[in-house]
Amino acid sequence: MFIESFKVESPNVKYTENEIHSVYDYETTEVVHENRNGTYQWVVKPKTVKYDFKTDTRVPKLGVMLVGWGGNNGSTLTAGVIANKEGISWATKDKVQQANYFGSLTQASSIRVGSYNGEEIYAPFKSLLPMVNPDDVVFGGWDISDMNLADAMARARVLDIDLQKQLRPYMEHMVPLPGIYDPDFIAANQGSRANSVIKGTKKEQVDQIIKDMREFKEKNKVDKLVVLWTANTERYSDVVVGLNDTMENLLASVEKNESEISPSTLYAIACVLEGIPFINGSPQNTFVPGLIELAISKNCLIGGDDFKSGQTKMKSVLVDFLVGAGIKPTSIVSYNHLGNNDGMNLSAPQTFRSKEISKSNVVDDMVASNGILFEPGEHPDHVVVIKYVPYVGDSKRAMDEYTSEIFMGGKNTIVMHNTCEDSLLAAPIILDLVLLAELSTRIQFKAEGEGKFHSFHPVATILSYLTKAPLVPAGTPVVNALSKQRAMLENILRACVGLAPENNMILEYK
């Protein structure tokens, strides 16, 4: 059975006019290596920690500024939100299609809340806590091309023509602000698009971004703003002592106009200085050590890296299944070809390397979890190939071969072909990232014994379900397995309303 909404009744949960308070017993384990009777033993000790959660239920008017607004992702997302808000339908060769938010975790997935008369009861994911309605989001952003969003939508060749015709009047007046352009960080083939750029030194560029954000907030009367990078993949920046290794050195390098400070890092600096959440949707190392330190010092949310939308999402499920089933993956070969601007930019070796790194590390935690299958340091052979084929456009082809060792020396091979409509998969992920980033800024908590409530760590691991290479605080384990990432996110939000984590034991029926 599916219900649209619910309210929790519990002595541990209190609803006030503007807040939800919950008291939550977090049950976990502590592993110690102890000397007992002259022999060291591993001992697992269950423990319970009491947490207080406090969630502000006042939903703000949200503005979202996209870096690369005129690209395939930005134009597709903007078009999709307008189509949903206006209730647009359009004819395809198969049927009359209604606008929807399929592919969005927050808008189109469900959670189990319990059972009723022996039947499982499910509710929308978004019913857990008050979230911004995507129809109410105000979009804006920057681009190195001055093309309006209607023309950008046509150039992208993602949406059906009938839909594009209906959306054009809503989008032709939407023109991105000039963006930061540095040809050293992206492929040379992007130069032909760069007709709307912010001139000046890096300090002047940061100041301009800050000015743009302030004016956007004022003009649109938004309460909160989230900025997300969906522009070109950049090459990796060199991390150098004295340049970008500390907060002070990074800010000084901006003042000195150091060439190795990337455009994405400049946008992120501007956001952090303004206390505006910044999310990196591409694989480059935007978050150099100095920037992470700056975000922590300002308690400003940062998240990334790289949207997890197609091939990598499948990989984070399949490898988790194989290793969890006691099957040993020994070779993973991933091939992609695509024809959109992302593919053209990735045809340059230095930008491809950024993508290769984010795609290749996705299985590390799953391999490390099973010392029966893998010796220390052992790892499957893992190769990632991306080629640019203009004809296929946004319809990316992903082909994977997984070779594994099975019982008694046997071999198992799984071959998968996945046609990933790149921007149609990425757009709802962008939506989830900005909505969850905003929501997380309204949640505070404290452990038993702590005096004051505090927000989540500025490095937002809560967003990891949506990213290929999750950014985590120093000393925090990186989790890539998709099921674990979703469980983490759902269970944290459940804790905010006093619900136990979903453990699937269903003991009442055993």
UniProtKB/Swiss-Prot annotation:
Per UniProt, the keywords (alphabetical) are: Cytoplasm, Inositol biosynthesis, Isomerase, Lipid biosynthesis, Lipid metabolism, NAD, Nucleus, Phospholipid biosynthesis, Phospholipid metabolism
Per its UniProt record, what Pfam families does this chain match?
Answer: Inos-1-P_synth, NAD_binding_5
- Identify the EC number(s): 5.5.1.4
GO molecular function terms noted in the UniProt entry: inositol-3-phosphate synthase activity
User: A single GO CC term, please?
Assistant: cytoplasm
Name the catalysed reactions.
D-glucose 6-phosphate = 1D-myo-inositol 3-phosphate
Q: Which cofactor does it need?
A: NAD(+)
According to its UniProt record, this protein's enzyme class is isomerase
For this chain's UniProt record, which GO biological process terms are given?
inositol biosynthetic process; phospholipid biosynthetic process
Compartments annotated for it: namely: Cytoplasm, Cytosol; Nucleus
List positions binding NAD(+). 70-73, 143, 180, 190, 193, 230-233, 281-282, 306, 309, 340-342, 355, 393-394, 422-423
Domain of life of the source: Eukaryota
Its annotated pathway reads: Polyol metabolism; myo-inositol biosynthesis; myo-inositol from D-glucose 6-phosphate: step 1/2
Keyword Metal-binding found = no
Q: Check the record and name the Gene3D superfamilies matching this protein.
A: NAD(P)-binding Rossmann-like Domain
Family per record = Belongs to the myo-inositol 1-phosphate synthase family.
PANTHER family in the cross-refs = MYO-INOSITOL-1 PHOSPHATE SYNTHASE
**What is known about what this protein does?**
Key enzyme in myo-inositol biosynthesis pathway that catalyzes the conversion of glucose 6-phosphate to 1-myo-inositol 1-phosphate in a NAD-dependent manner.
This chain belongs to the protein called Inositol-3-phosphate synthase
Q: Which organism is it from?
A: Triticum aestivum
